[in-house]
Amino acid sequence: PFLTEMKKIHDEAESDVRWHNHEFEPPTITWNIGINDHTKAVNITPPQSICTVYFRPMPGQDGNILLERSRQAAEQNGLEFTVPVNGDPIYTDPNCDFVEEVLQIAGKEKATTVSYGTDGAKLTALKKLIVCGPGSIAQAHTHDEWIALDQLEKGAGLYTRLIKHWCC
């Protein structure tokens, strides 16, 4: 029953517009379900399985509603429920002066809104917060994550210009 509820939440997040934000692509929250039995063979029935859900809420939404539904489903089924990491989504208006200033320094015309989590969620107390950097997100967070050296050099150049602009 717990996994059924996790699947219901996943499907609701995909189909219910109250969980969508069209500034992002894709416009849906992330509710990524994983199950680990810690077995090495498919014909072994383990004494315990672990269900993990990677949840990335969208700005302006109360993700605690879904966390509480999950907690209640776990309690109803006698399961342990923990939230090891929790952070608010990062959002800075792409038309604000700070973003415009970064765009000018970066030599770019337009900011884009991205739909992935970062460690920046731990820095949301900062008043001016954006995520920027080199490379392609398509190369990141894969089993063979990598970045081209020319992209790394471009990133170092951008960070140098930003530091010189605000710190020197």
What are these model-predicted stretches?
Residues 1-168:
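Metal-dependent amide/peptide-bond hydrolase catalytic core
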